[in-house]
Amino acid sequence: SRACRWIGSTLADADSPPCVRLGAGGDRDAAERLGEQALAAGRIGAVLVAGGQGSRLGCEGPKGLYRVGPISDASLFELLFGGLLAVRRRYGRDVPLAIMTSAATDAGTRAFLAAHDYCGLDPRLVLVFQQAELPALDAASGDLLLDGPGRLATAPDGHGGLLVALRTCGGLEWFAGHGVEHVATFQVDNPLA
């Protein structure tokens, strides 16, 4: 099989593709102008990947609820949504936002949005959808894990399932219905996005 060809290989055996420098030369300025034109025309949408729980951070519920603002005590959600509000102020257009949650974070995310009046975002321009779940495997043995007697344990399918989940929930049509031609994707635990 194809995978067996690589058994015993080392990194030194690998072919390295040529390095491609992004944003080199005058291309960056032109790209920024095109991006600003697309924002001003309302052709940009955003997808927030927010399926993770905040347990490693000591936060109950969705990771987006974790408070990181040193002075404002703002949550990750509030900081990220603030960036979209800044785009609205600068370009005069809202950015439609799709938020991918998981079974573990969906209800908490929806409750947060409702309790905080969508942090100033237009609720009609926010789509919340869930990523799929896959059977959980033991990392060492590869065996299926059980969540209880006769019940398979599952886990979110991760970032790789984003496009399928977006298509399955009707998100691609939703974006198109709002005039979106380009989508920027960012993660909930990146407050600088």
What kind of feature is each model-predicted range?
Residues 1-28:
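Low-complexity, highly charged intrinsically disordered N-terminal segments
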